[in-house]
């Protein structure tokens, strides 16, 4: 059949475009079936819509400095700083125009982030210039916040605190510090609380890595990460137990991926299959809270097969004979499997990979520390590294991923209720 369009009473077509298409179709295909008719009709309608929209399209004009409210003569500076989110410490170049932080770039020559940014770091500027940023003192009056001056705020707060101390004593006030404070701020806060006459102060480390500080310090004298993020590229094997670095410390995993390119083996031990586990060579699922049985199960196989570093232990470690005695007597493979649900073959595999690929490192975060047995879990991890002779060597050690950007420094000198700055007392 032919595709034609009915004319109006004057004989003229109501659409020149459709008439042109109809004549073309009739010349090219004198007859067509129903399917071809529907297909070609759709093409014609689409072409008509496209042509009708041409007059609505307009080239955008370039925004001039005057139109944008700028003169183009602003002073631009680049300030080198450090990301304030997690403990990785990625370097950031902040671009500042007329004193305002306008944009940022990751630092490519930084040995830590190597020009990389995670989603948290990319949003760092919003901490200073976000719409919800508090820029001045506010006071709640009749259910609404009103702006007040700094002098008024300091005077009212000071008066109220002195009244509280007079009525109820200095311990009536509890001061919460911060792991976001720099060392100087944390130190001054601790001193201020002491001058106030109280010891009621603390910060995020209490529910973060305070168990790490105590556990590591009680094992070899100081409670801190022994190596560094970029040193992990020298590791031959890495055991992640209690850490989901891919999400909590994304840039840190960059160094492990570089290490894997060089042949490093990666083991992830976790109750959940995480994004970190997705990058591992081996994933071992254990029962939540059973880290100690698993680690001691690894020690059992290390001692049984003679994989321990005997010279290192004799030269540098005290009391390992008692640890070995307890492990061999109490943490046999059947007891370990009963406690943590991991078959003997999987525990053996993890122990063998760590022992035969040295230097090997162990990584943990709050998957270990946020337990009532956090100190003991941390000590078990440290003992494993001492047995293998991995402490004090490049590519080994305990890589403890802290939660906040200065939680280590704030813990060292800041508002801990159980010690003075520098862990005195």
Task: Label the predicted regions.
Residues 52, 162-167, 349-368:
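Short amphipathic alpha-helical segments at helix boundaries and their inter-helical linkers
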Residues 190, 334, 352, 382-385:
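Active-site phosphate/pyrophosphate- and oxyanion-stabilizing loops and adjacent acidic/basic residues
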Residues 238, 279-280, 331-335, 363-368:
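Flexible glycine/proline-enriched surface loops and loop-helix/loop-strand junctions
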Residues 289, 293-361:
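P-loop NTPase catalytic nucleotide-binding module
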Residues 174-181, 338-342, 365-372, 404:
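Conserved short loop/turn motifs at secondary-structure junctions
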Residues 168-172, 308-313, 361, 392-399:
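Flexible, glycine/charged-enriched surface loops at secondary-structure junctions
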Residues 354-425:
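A glycine-rich, hydrophobic/aromatic-adjacent loop/helix-cap motif
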Residues 2-305, 316, 323, 343:
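N-terminal export/assembly segments and adjacent metallocofactor-ligating motifs
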């Amino acid at each position: 059949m032919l595709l034609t369009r009915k004319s109006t009473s004057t004989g003229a077509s109501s659409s020149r475009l459709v008439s042109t298409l109809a004549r073309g179709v009739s010349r090219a295909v004198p007859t067509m079936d129903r399917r071809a008719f529907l297909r070609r009709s759709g093409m014609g309608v689409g072409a008509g819509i496209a042509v009708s929209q041409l007059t609505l399209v307009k080239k955008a004009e370039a925004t001039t400095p005057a139109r944008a409210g700028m003169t183009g003569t602003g002073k631009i500076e680049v300030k080198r700083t450090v990301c304030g989110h997690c403990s990785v410490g990625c370097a950031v170049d902040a671009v500042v125009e007329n004193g305002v932080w306008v944009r940022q770039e990751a630092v490519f020559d930084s040995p830590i982030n190597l020009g990389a940014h995670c989603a948290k770091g990319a949003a760092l500027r919003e901490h200073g210039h976000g719409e919800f940023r508090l820029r001045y003192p506010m006071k709640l009056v009749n259910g609404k916040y009103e702006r007040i001056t700094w002098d008024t705020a300091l005077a009212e707060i000071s008066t109220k605190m002195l009244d509280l101390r007079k009525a109820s004593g200095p311990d009536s006030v509890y001061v919460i510090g911060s792991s976001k404070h720099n060392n100087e701020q944390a130190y001054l806060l601790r001193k201020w609380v002491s001058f106030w006459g109280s010891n009621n102060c603390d910060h995020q480390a209490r529910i973060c890595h305070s168990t790490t500080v105590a556990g590591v310090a009680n094992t070899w004298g100081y409670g801190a990460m022994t190596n560094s993020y970029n040193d992990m590229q020298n590791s031959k094997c890495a055991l992640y137990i209690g850490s989901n670095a891919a999400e909590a410390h994304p840039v840190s995993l960059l160094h492990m991926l570089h290490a894997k390119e060089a042949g490093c083996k990666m083991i992830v031990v976790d109750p959940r299959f995480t994004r970190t586990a997705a990058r591992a060579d081996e994933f071992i699922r254990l029962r939540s809270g059973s880290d100690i049985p698993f680690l001691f199960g690894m020690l059992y196989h290390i001692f049984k097969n003679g994989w321990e570093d005997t010279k290192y232990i004799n030269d540098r470690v005290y009391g390992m004979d008692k640890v070995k005695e307890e492990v061999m007597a109490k943490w046999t493979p059947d007891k370990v499997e009963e406690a943590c649900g991991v078959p003997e073959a999987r525990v053996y595999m993890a122990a063998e990979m760590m022992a035969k690929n040295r230097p090997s490192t162990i990584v943990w975060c709050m998957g270990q520390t946020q337990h009532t047995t956090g100190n003991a879990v941390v000590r078990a991890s440290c003992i494993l590294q001492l047995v293998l002779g991995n402490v004090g060597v490049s590519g080994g050690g305990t890589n403890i991923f802290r939660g906040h950007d200065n939680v280590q420094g704030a813990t060292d000198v800041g508002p801990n209720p159980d010690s003075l700055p520098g862990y005195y007392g």
